[in-house]
Amino acid sequence: MDSLKTKLGGCLLGVLTNRNGLIESFSLDSLRKVSVLGGYQIPTLEEVLQLVNGEVMLNIELKGDQTALLTHELITRYFDREGSQWKPERIFISSFDWDELKIFYEVNKEVPIAILTEDDPLDAIPIGLQLGAFAINPDFEKLTPEVVQKIHQSGFEIYPWTVNTSEDIERMKMLRVKGIITDFPDRINQTF
């Protein structure tokens, strides 16, 4: 379940739910009552880890303050759990909050990091290098052939967000990004 980050730093429930307001203002019990489009319930990260069990790559986006250490503790338990298929290379951590990424990197250098940015993608290169990130994930509208080339030359993969129209998906393929973040994976007629 995704949410919208406000300019003030809070996370709003998106238009795909039956509730409005800051996620931080809801208790876990209240969030359990939120209905996502199609009548689905919002899963906890722990429920997602149990369900997926390492069968696919998982992008965990840190969206709130003080989420880095809690996320590290939770995923580490799954790495160590008997019968778990989770390994550090099956998860990556991303965030627009670069301070949270720094905190995560201080305690866990095994799990890959991707830098999310809504500003000039080139501004993310220094923090990406500092944190040993594997990818920079910018707003797709900020990508040009020159920007893509500079990011690639700096050693990063690119997974732009949120690429939803068929035309934009094709443009990202032409720019030779590694993959995309989309709300409509069924619109992708071939893999990147």
Mark where each language-model region is.
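Metal-dependent phosphodiesterase/phospholipase catalytic core, i.e.
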Residues: 4-111, 115-119, 131-134, 138, ...
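C-terminal active-site rim and adjoining tail of enzyme catalytic domains
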Residues: 2, 33-45, 112-192
